[in-house]
Regions:
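Conserved beta-strand-loop-alpha-helix hinge in the C-terminal portion
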Residues: 207-240
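Conserved catalytic segment of ABC-fold P-loop ATPases
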Residues: 197-204
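Short hydrophobic beta-strand elements within the C-terminal catalytic ATPase subdomain
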Residues: 56, 204-205
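Extended, non-globular alpha-helical segments
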Residues: 161-164, 238-251
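A general structural signal marking secondary-structure boundaries and capping sites
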Residues: 3, 123, 150, 206, ...
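ABC family nucleotide-binding domain
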Residues: 1-182, 186-191, 198
């Protein structure tokens, strides 16, 4: 996968092969600039591969994937819209929900309120984003990415800008949402503890041009509590991943 940068063509990904089963929670880690975010844009159809194919449920991806939801490092909520209206925005602009929005608005609003309750924000629908903390805004962002009931959730470092305590709190929020709704997740993160706590499998990428150089299964029983992060076995996996990433950074 190449793209045009300021100084010419950049080879971001090369000979990359990644297979994620339906319902899996996958995490992608690797050194900065290895192509993790490029991989995410390929999977969601925002970029077309210059070689090879991307397929979801056996169908080649040729454009933006409607069954996918996305959340990023910054919540990017519209400050002039109330929380409930920020949640409903994807349903207002994406088909087939757009054509149904007027007739199903009551149903869609109930869905949004149910999501807010699930993430501990019951009663906050009529607030504006600037009235919420950073952690609360990220909860709203997660809800917005799930409002159209996607089968695939793509997360690009969604908790990176938060403090450690809020970050761990939102790990548990995401864990509970995934266990309740059972969508497929691909999480791009630099936080190795986050990856080990949340994922079924961790895909380690090389330095650019990015390739998958290791797939690390995580076998801790579910549901996982934060107590598992203090186990020696947990720390051992984190150290193994850190050593692998250090190795590929200089290779």
């Amino acid at each position: 996968m190449r793209y045009r940068g300021a100084s010419g063509d950049v080879l971001a990904l090369q000979d990359i092969s990644l297979s994620v089963r339906k319902g899996e929670f996958a995490a992608v880690v690797g050194p900065s600039g290895c192509g993790k975010s490029t991989l995410m844009r390929l999977v969601t159809g925002l970029h077309r591969p210059t070689a090879g194919t991307v397929s979801i449920e056996g169908k080649e991806v040729t454009g933006p994937v409607k069954i996918a939801g996305m959340a990023f490092q910054h919540a990017n909520l519209l400050p002039w819209r109330k929380v409930i209206d920020n949640l409903l925005l994807p349903l207002e602009i994406v088909q087939p929900h757009r054509s149904q929005f007027r007739t199903k608005k009551k149903e869609f609003r109930a869905r949004a309120e149910a999501l807010l309750e699930t993430v501990g924000l019951k009663g906050f629908g009529d607030r504006y984003p600037w009235e919420l903390s950073g952690g609360m805004q990220q909860r709203v962002s997660l809800c917005r990415s799930l409002i159209h009931e996607p089968e695939l959730l793509m997360l690009d470092e969604p908790f990176a800008a938060l403090d450690a305590f809020t970050r761990e709190e939102l790990w548990c929020v995401l864990r509970d949402l995934w266990q309740k709704l059972r969508f497929t997740v691909i999480l791009v993160t630099h936080d190795l503890r986050e990856a080990v706590f949340l994922a079924d499998n961790i895909y380690v990428m090389s330095a650019r041009p990015g390739r998958i150089v290791q797939v690390k299964p995580v076998d801790f029983p579910r549901p996982r509590s934060l107590e598992v992060t203090y186990d020696k076995a947990f720390a051992d996996i984190v150290h193994e991943l850190r050593a692998k990433i250090a190795q590929v950074r200089i290779s």
